[in-house]
Amino acid sequence: MTELKYSWFPGCSAGSTGIAYTQSAKYVADKIGLEMKEIDDWCCCGTSAARITDDDLMHALPARSLALSERQYPGLDVVAPCTGCYSALKGAQHWARQSEENRKHVSELIDMDYAAKADVKSLLEIMVEPDVVDLTVSRLQKTLGGMKIACYYGCTQVRPAEVCNFDDVENPTSMERLLDACGAECVEWGFKTECCGASNHVVKPKAARKAVERIFRNAKACGAEAIVTSCPLCWLNLDMREQQINSEMGTDYHLPVYYFTELLAMAMGATPDEAGLGYHFEPAAQLAQDRIVADTKTEEVTR
């Protein structure tokens, strides 16, 4: 098994709206021996705002942090937990690798040499490696207890295919494999990669709420009792809007929205607060506590 050591790009949401993701990810990382070295002086990746503003800005912002990582942690690949950050960093890396002209141009923009040799990976991409899945299962104190889960990847976890080269763009299954191995029951549904409308909530709030409602409606119709994601923007948009949608549309959705790392942390022995469940808008602790329980099989595996 390769050494689990990576350069860590936390992203802007890590200490704010995505703090539950950061907290649970670090808990899991500690349990499985995943070492993540934070890039010193990293900057905002620019995400979609830079993408619609200027091509040079879109490439320069993530390339700067990637170049710093190459200087500080030579030979280490970069892990970006936020899928928005992952998309931006992966896109800049892909563009720089297309030609020496591109690489030199972005190096001039950031006034640093960017070699574009280290790979960029999402946290999910690391966690679903077969050896890491086996290691994760070996660290469980409890199972996910057959919790019926709708795995939600969002727009950028697997797209575009030529850049990400990770899982199927229409029907990804990597998160399901990980959570199934930990005792969950992942449902089949068709909204795994549908947009939640997060970027439209300011300019087109009705359209965005409609997108969120469709996701909850379809997850519930497919028998899910929770939605699990790897994207801080999706998590915030879904979790924050659920009660609002119930009030405005007369629906009755009460599906907790979890990060996949929160469930893994709970199964590894974390309390709800340690796993980050106290940061949710829709109450999430009770379902997790009810479903995530020790059983004979888990006790034998972890003994």
Describe the residue ranges of each PLM region.
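Iron-sulfur cluster-binding electron-transfer modules in prokaryotic oxidoreductases
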Residues: 1-303
